[in-house]
Regions:
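Short, Lys/Arg-enriched C-terminal cap helix and immediately downstream tail that follows
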Residues: 2-6, 99-102, 170-175, 210-224
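Short, charged helix-capping/linker segments at alpha-helix termini
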Residues: 4-5, 27-36, 46-64, 222-224
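Acidic, proline/glycine-rich intrinsically disordered inter-domain spacer in sigma factors
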Residues: 10, 114-168
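Sigma70-family region 2
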Residues: 27-28, 51-55, 64-81, 96, ...
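Residue-level preference for hydrophobic side chains embedded in well-ordered alpha helices
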Residues: 37, 41, 45, 65, ...
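Amphipathic, Lys/Arg- and hydrophobic-enriched alpha-helical face
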Residues: 38-56, 71-72, 167, 173, ...
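Arg/Lys-rich amphipathic alpha helix in sigma70-family domain 2
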Residues: 74-78, 88-109, 116-129, 156, ...
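Helix-turn-helix DNA-binding module
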Residues: 152-153, 157, 161-176, 180, ...
Length: 224
């Protein structure tokens, strides 16, 4: 096998042109290409699977997903990006495992627009408009920058931990959406494709998730 330790940038970014190169290398048995792909996506896969499963089960599902990728790569037709295809396999296996363990409902059952609308909302003026050229739907007033003193750096680390705690406390559906949108920085279309939700529902769920995380962070600073 070729001794390839990493993917070229275009391929690592998951574009369609790069996808073809990666798929060809995987089909040819390029171990280096597979390891690079595994290193690139496994952390995000584990975070997503952990939205529904305990850590040990999530790790097993990630391993099962990679085995399925290797077995199914010759059947990959390129109708979606390679990344979307991999994460769709992960999502399906996560749902199956979670249902088998009696831990949760399918994602579609968790996304209830009427229940989302009934939740306490944050003033819409606190968000940038949908047509904002750079940061649509993001907070209009971001948190102020922290300084460089040891105390301020400690506060930054503590606040990051508090943000993760707030994300971990979200309902499964909201946790998945905010993880993919804000932690992994996926495009909305990719999130909708992998999770099987509409663009409208994705926006609603993300808004609710961000609102809860923001409230938790504001409470943290009030108490700090």
């Amino acid at each position: 096998m070729p001794d390839t330790q990493e993917l070229p940038p275009a391929e690592a970014d998951g574009g369609r042109e790069g996808d073809r190169g990666v798929v060809d290398r995987l089909r040819a048995g390029d171990e280096g290409a597979f390891v690079a792909l595994l290193d690139r996506h496994s952390p995000a896969m584990l975070r997503l699977a952990s939205c529904h499963l305990p850590h040990a089960s999530a790790e097993e599902v990630v391993q099962e997903t990679w085995l399925a990728v290797l077995k199914g790569i010759r059947r990959f037709e390129g109708r979606s990006s390679l990344k979307t295809w991999i994460f769709s396999i992960l999502t399906n296996r996560t749902k199956t495992r979670a249902q088998r363990e009696g831990r949760t409902l399918p994602f579609s059952a968790l996304v209830n627009p009427s229940e989302e609308a009934a939740e306490p909302s944050v003033d819409p003026t606190r968000f940038l408009p949908a047509d904002h050229p750079q940061w649509p739907h993001h907070w209009a007033t971001p948190p102020k920058s922290w300084g460089e003193s040891p105390e301020e750096r400690l506060l930054t680390r503590e606040s990051q931990a508090r943000i993760q705690q707030a994300i971990d406390a979200l309902p499964h559906g909201q946790r998945q959406v905010i993880t993919l949108c804000d932690v992994e920085e996926w495009e909305p279309e990719e999130v909708c494709s992998v999770l099987g939700v509409t663009r409208t529902n994705q926006r609603v769920i993300l808004h609710r998730a961000r609102s809860k995380v923001r409230r938790a962070l504001e409470q943290y600073f009030e108490d700090a």
